[in-house]
């Protein structure tokens, strides 16, 4: 037995609570009119007219108490209204025509620019609708060729309400020793702000062959986006603006293709199998990006992919002191033989920010694909699914250039936290890293093409720069799923 000892760790405090008052409402109205009719058994005509209107408002007392401008913004509801329509015509299930339009209004724009008109057209042709095609090509069950072109508007350009308005700010002490109040332009409004418009083009083909055992769909698309909302960067300082205004100045295109295919075969009345696959490929290019005038063309964002990784081109590792002396000066702290050697892109004899170039796409896959199938025997089904990516770039250093702020290199980079962290066996292995001959006793370990630079204690500024040295092809193929299904006959349940 023993005695329970009690020790006072914290002083008692009164119970506290918080209270938040928040109100939200939304009103939505919509109506729709449909029309459909078939004439002479060959002409199919349908139409749709759709109207909607919405209004929503969020009122937060904390915001109301703190900021007069925010209170004013939240006092005005967020409102939209729009009218859209579609006319569809089909002739003998062989020729198709779709006409669409959208007339949408948003409160995010100034009066006169609030409504945008966005038309679209789509056409389709089914060659298998002809009798002679079915007779000449009996193995072709269905074939459709289609294309579309249309525009889509975007008003979600910024998180700020009414970006076309210029906001004023008041304060005390106007400078130069004065204590008088002042009024200044806090935000310059984009008074000519308009809808961001995407022009979308798509061409596709669909087919069913061999008694509909083989089915496929393939699409090719091209999108051109104009009027991307960006902060102006080319206004000179002598304009006297503390904050740059925004405008519809950005342009970008994206393009790609996607499709799927499947094949089903009955072996006998109890046994069959299905094979299927799909893919998606996409890429983009910035046509105009608002930025200050750059010294070198490769520093421009225009002409390159959106959010391209930018960094230094690695030339391997410094072989020895003579190699360092004969190379351009690198401005990332001290460096020794075995450290990463970078390319002097502009040829000025110094490696600095002016030598950063676009290295590759960002680290999302440009190509995604999958394939699999099922094998069926009576009530038993076995299935398998594979997924993979291609054209995927990855770097073992974060793209902000600071290893201690990102997570890409964690567990892979020695002493990731500066003077703390792990050293993986793959890095410590002398066959994978540059090692001085004075330590290994073998001159061949001073390999300028080693997978890793010299092993150094603490953060090495020279080796932590974002560069092609840390590039890794991140494509993969994995077994996503294996399934086994058995259907119990209804009579046994």
Where are the language model's segments positioned?
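Short, surface-exposed charged micro-motifs
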Residues: 86, 332, 372
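C-terminal beta-signal and adjacent terminal beta-strands/loops
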Residues: 138-141, 225, 285, 374-465, ...
């Amino acid at each position: 037995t023993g005695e329970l000892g009690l020790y006072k760790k914290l002083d008692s405090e009164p119970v506290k609570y918080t209270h938040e008052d928040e109100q939200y409402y939304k009103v939505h109205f919509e109506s729709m009119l449909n029309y459909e009719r078939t004439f002479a058994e060959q002409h199919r005509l349908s139409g749709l007219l759709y109207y909607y209107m919405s209004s929503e408002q969020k009122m937060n007392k904390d915001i109301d108490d703190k900021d007069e401008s925010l209170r004013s913004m939240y006092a005005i509801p967020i409102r939209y209204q729009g009218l859209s329509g579609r006319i569809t015509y089909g002739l003998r299930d062989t020729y198709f025509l779709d006409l669409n339009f959208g007339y949408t209004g948003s409160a995010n724009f100034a009066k006169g620019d609030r409504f945008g008109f966005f038309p679209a057209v789509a056409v389709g042709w089914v060659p298998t609708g002809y009798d002679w095609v079915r007779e000449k090509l009996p193995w072709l069950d269905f074939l459709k060729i289609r294309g579309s072109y249309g525009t889509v508007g975007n008003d979600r350009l910024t998180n700020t309400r009414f970006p076309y308005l210029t906001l004023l700010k008041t304060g005390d002490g106007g400078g130069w020793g004065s204590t008088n109040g002042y009024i200044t332009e806090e935000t310059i409004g984009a008074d000519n702000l308009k809808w961001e418009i995407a022009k979308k083009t798509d061409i596709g083909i669909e087919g069913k062959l061999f008694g509909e055992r083989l089915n496929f769909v393939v699409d090719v698309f091209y999108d051109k986006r104009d009027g991307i909302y960006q902060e102006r960067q080319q206004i000179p300082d002598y304009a006297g603006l503390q904050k740059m205004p925004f405008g519809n100045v950005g342009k970008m295109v994206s393009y790609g293709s996607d499709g799927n295919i499947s094949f089903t075969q009955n072996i006998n009345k109890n046994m069959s199998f299905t094979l299927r696959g799909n893919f998606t490929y996409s890429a983009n290019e910035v046509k105009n990006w608002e930025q200050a005038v750059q010294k070198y063309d490769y520093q421009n964002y225009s002409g390159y992919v959106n959010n391209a990784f930018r960094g230094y081109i690695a030339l391997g590792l410094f072989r020895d002191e003579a190699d360092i002396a004969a190379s351009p000066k690198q401005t990332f702290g001290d460096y020794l033989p075995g450290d990463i050697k970078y390319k002097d892109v502009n040829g000025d004899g110094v490696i600095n920010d002016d030598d950063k170039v676009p290295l590759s796409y960002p680290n999302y896959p440009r190509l995604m694909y999958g394939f699999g199938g099922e094998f069926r025997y009576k009530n038993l089904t076995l299935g398998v699914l594979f997924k993979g990516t291609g054209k995927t770039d990855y770097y073992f250093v974060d793209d902000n250039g600071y290893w201690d702020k990102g997570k890409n290199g964690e567990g892979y980079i020695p002493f990731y936290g500066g003077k703390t962290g792990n050293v993986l066996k793959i890095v410590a292995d002398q066959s994978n890293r540059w090692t001085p001959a004075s330590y290994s006793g073998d001159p061949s370990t001073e390999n300028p093409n080693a997978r890793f630079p010299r092993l150094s204690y603490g953060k090495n500024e020279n080796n932590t720069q974002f560069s092609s040295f840390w590039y890794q092809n991140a494509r993969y193929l994995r077994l996503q799923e294996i399934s086994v299904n058995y259907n119990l006959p209804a009579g046994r349940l």
